[in-house]
């Protein structure tokens, strides 16, 4: 296993410390953030991340949007008061963010989606601008023949774990997730039999440093990317299924 870890490090760095210089975050309207181009399978981590990238089925609410551009500009989000403003897809294209790490002998890959708004319907509209959802895929057989052993999807309370993933939730190597809600809840991720869509995948270490820095900082109460070091490693600890 130690040789496997060194092999992955040599082919594609997958960890980065939050020790870079700080600077002011700039913002752009949510529909003007340009996504990063999708990663190429140019290292082993990226190959595996692309191979096992989940599908996302949207049953209600906003579609995923880019959260940050190459210059570090982040999305302003969409206020809940704009009830009739569409958020069914960015004209610039969609994005899913990935970050990988070998944790306790397993390869963990987080896939995270950004939504400009989240709300629920009760007697009145309740919600907030900016929302993140994520799932952690846990794999064994890191280099030669990776195998999906478990999926931990962020739910309303903690993580819902699918171990092993049932075939009805799979399409080839892709786990099918749904962005859903219950009547009085905010949105969350759950497994689904329904096919979804793929977004352009950008991995943490393929992003620019300005983009990573902007995602490290908390610019508002709800723009808290799960990809930053503290939240990422906390997610690995809490979602560990073995």
Curated annotation (Swiss-Prot):
It comes from the Eukaryota. InterPro entries: NPP1. A motif (Conserved heptapeptide motif) lies at residues 127-133. Its main location: secreted. A motif (Conserved undecapeptide motif) lies at residues 108-118. The keyword DNA-binding does not apply. Keywords: Glycoprotein, Secreted, Signal, Virulence. GO terms for cellular component: extracellular region. Probable secreted effector that may act as a pathogen-associated molecular pattern (PAMP) recognized by the plant immune system. Belongs to the Necrosis inducing protein (NPP1) family. This is NLP effector protein 8. It comes from Plasmopara viticola. The gene is NLP8.
